[in-house]
Amino acid sequence: MALRRVLLFVKPFDVYPPRPLAAAASSPPPPPPPLRVSNPKVLNYLDDRCRVHKETINLCKSVLQRKSIDWISVQRNDMSNPIHDVDLVISVGGDGTLLRASHFLNSSIPVLGVNSDPTCPDEVDELTDEFDARRSTGHLCAATAANFEQILDATLDGSRQPSELSRISVKLNGLQLPTYALNDILVSHPCPASVSRFSFRKRSNTGESSHLINCRSSGLRVATPAGSTAAMLSAGGFVMPISSHELQYMIREPISPRDADKPLLHGLVKQGQHILVVWYNEEGAVYFDGSHVMHSIQHGDTLEISSDAPILKVILPENLLKQGS
């Protein structure tokens, strides 16, 4: 079926601090605001990031206006209900914006990510001794301003097909939580300096189970294949094939684990398996794809974590398509 109803899902403009306004010559200089950035190179960098992001949004809107499609635009912070009645969602920002969009999508509506402000390697090299000049991460974004119309046309005419990516399902005390994670989840104490106390075991749908592992650690991270290149990889995990339907889990900074438990502190959750967690702190949290979506947990709560979740259809960049299975 032709894709003729499009939702443009955009990162807000005002995500960076504004440049201080110049005071009139006759006015005394105002006191500097607390923690205001004053390095002119940093200010120019932030200004340029806003400019490039706005230009990309305007370009996307201009391209859509030339197509025989119905479309609307919404800022990501204004979205609170599931997305229905569209054939395609276009996220404009970076991976974070695509992840936010995914939380409102079922398995039927594809999403195309546009990296609105890609990192410029020469800029990073030039400024690396002064500040971090990296820009937007777009690992899952198939398009930039340079190729947006080409990728959009291929998507609209069906020559560019979406890939089906696994997501993470979490049940709390047997009840399904409404958010499905596209990247990863983190189960931990809400204070990063506190120890997370919990037990877990891997269990299959046929009833087979690992032995119980009692943990004191910094928490439990579970990643999808799409999320295996993010925090999981930074923590010592491995990159998974993007088309895999397995999950990768890791206990973060385990405290004095038993030798018998060590082989199970990092591994895979295959299809037909889940991780069963019992939480033993007074308070805790499950974070979905970063810090924006969080569900509180308390002592005695159980979590069932698996890939038994609706897939997400994503138009992937060529390098991920070539990764294969």
Curated annotation (Swiss-Prot):
The keyword Hydrolase does not apply. This is Probable NADH kinase. It comes from the Eukaryota. One of its GO terms (molecular function) is NAD+ kinase activity. InterPro entries: ATP-NAD_kinase_N, ATP-NAD_kinase_PpnK-typ_C, NAD/diacylglycerol_kinase_sf, NADK. The keyword Chloroplast does not apply. GO terms for cellular component: cytoplasm. GO terms for biological process: NAD metabolic process; NADP biosynthetic process. It catalyses: NADH + ATP = ADP + NADPH + H(+). Keywords: ATP-binding, Cytoplasm, Kinase, NAD, NADP, Nucleotide-binding, Transferase. Key source of the cellular reductant NADPH which is an important antioxidant factor. Its EC number is 2.7.1.86. Homodimer. The lineage of its organism: Eukaryota, Viridiplantae, Streptophyta, Embryophyta, Tracheophyta. It comes from Oryza sativa subsp. japonica. It is found in: Cytoplasm. Belongs to the NAD kinase family.
